[in-house]
Amino acid sequence: GFSIRPDTASAIRRSRALLADIAPERIWTEMKKLLTGERPAAVLREYPEVVGVFWPEILPMVGFDQKNRHHCYDVWEHTLRAVAAVPPETELRLAALLHDIGKPNCFAEDAAGCGHFRGHPAESARMADVMLRRLRAETVIREAAVTLVMWHDRNIPRTRSGVAHALRDLGERDLRRLLALKRADNLAQAPAFRSMQKEIDRAEAILDELLTESACVSLKQLAVNGKDMTDMGLSGPAVGEMLERLLSAVMDGALPNDREALLTAARGRRETARDL
């Protein structure tokens, strides 16, 4: 591929302040091209101060020592390795770039000198939303990236029930994106802590099984509906609450997605509630 001459690279750095005069939409268009192109991590690694003109939030990550045995890289280098490890999809690479943006704000060191970043997914999601709004990113891209950032540090679902609930919450596309992000995030950690790859493989296999079986993970797929609930005397919020309880039981494997079984369970739960 092409490389930038040293004198050109110096000129880019010297002139970076001029980016402040360019329309946010134009910068966003170029950022999308960068993120989905070849070697985005290498470009970002070389020019963080240039990107920092319109996204100054990234600068505290550069050289930030995580002081944690799970991490052999500073926050910025960890981030770049995660970016390089996800497929070239705008939402995924954005999420990889911004998933730890809030870590410097959340850093705390314990008595043993170990670093912790409690609450960093929520802080990173908040900051990512602000940053993407600043460049007037498309709503669908912004919301997908922010959701992935918010979810990126949650435990990988290890059971059929866990994957079913995640599928219900995120949908297939974003759950697959989340697993890809978690895979990249784990690969960017210290080598001794990369065993999560097998858990991700297992979650993906369960997801494939659920989709192949057309497993019930939504109210639309449930064998009973709101009319069935009103026919047995439920009304108002109680209808939705009962349907949600039945759906959860089906996803957990406690009930089959069978109309008669669900109606029997609903009647039993209604009677139990009356007796309380």
Show the residue positions of the predicted features.
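Generic anion/oxyanion-binding catalytic loop in active/binding sites
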Residues: 16, 71, 113, 218, ...
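Internal alpha/beta core interface subdomains
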Residues: 1-20
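Glycine-rich, flexible loop/turn motifs
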Residues: 15-18, 54-60, 215-220
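Short linear loop/turn motifs
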Residues: 11, 57-66, 145-147, 237-249
